[in-house]
Design a protein with these regions (language model features):
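Boundary/entry segment of secreted carbohydrate-active catalytic domains
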Residues: 7-33
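Hydrophobic faces of well-ordered beta-strands that scaffold small-molecule active sites
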Residues: 18-22, 49-51, 85-89, 152-156
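A short, mixed-charge helix-start or loop-turn motif at secondary-structure junctions
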Residues: 20, 56-60, 119-124
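Active-site beta-loop-alpha junctions enriched in small/polar residues
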Residues: 25-27, 54, 90-94, 156-161
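Solvent-exposed, acidic/flexible segments
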Residues: 27, 31-34, 64-68, 123, ...
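Polysaccharide-binding and catalytic clefts of secreted carbohydrate-active enzymes
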Residues: 111-186
């Protein structure tokens, strides 16, 4: 079944419904509980969930290894139950292997020390290395799920500036200077 995403008319036969749900992190639980999760969602009237917000490490457990199997299964399970998927970019938290290989993706505090990895948005938004890896991830997600009828929205991110609102790295300084040049012409 193909659904056209038209906010706020979503998911109902008469076009009068709105999205009702929240974040769902199935990758943090045993697959054996997913059926109960979906049943309880249906019982609560949930018709949309945001999935994969913190899942980059599960989707790409190693630099050259991708695992979409679990995501395929949960999207299919949700969709067949009539619950639409708002698929996240999964960039809210980068995998630890990325920080280990490229510590320069971490933001820096005002003393030049890297901010610890492992929390939401522990990456520098101006890091070209982070952007390259994040873009690869987003392309893979779009290629795989771009035509999936159960994916009705793309969750690009929220709560910006959580752990990276202050970044004193050279990349941040250069990005700010470029912004000033473009805005003020000097």
């Amino acid at each position: 079944m193909h659904r056209t995403f038209k906010w706020p008319e979503l998911l109902t036969d008469n076009g009068k419904g709105i999205a009702y749900g929240g974040d769902y992190n199935p990758d943090q639980w045993s697959e054996s509980v997913w059926d109960d999760d979906v049943r309880l969602m249906k019982q609560a009237g949930v018709n949309t969930v945001a999935v994969a917000i913190f899942s980059w490490d599960r989707i790409q457990p190693e630099e050259n290894r991708w695992d979409f199997g679990w995501l395929d299964r949960i999207i299919d399970k949700l969709g067949k139950a009539g619950i639409a998927v708002d698929l996240a970019s999964a960039t809210a938290t980068a995998p630890l292997w990325l920080y280990e290989k490229h510590p320069e993706v971490l933001p820096q505090d005002k003393f030049g020390h890297p901010v610890n990895a492992g929390s939401r948005q522990s990456w520098s938004p101006t890091s070209p290395v982070f952007k390259e890896y994040a873009l690869t991830l987003c392309r893979k997600l779009a290629e795989r799920y771009g035509t999936n009828p159960y994916v009705t929205a793309w969750h690009m991110g929220n709560e910006y500036g959580w752990n990276n609102r202050y970044d004193y790295s050279d990349n941040a300084l250069n990005a700010f200077r470029l912004w000033c040049e473009r805005k003020y012409g000097t």
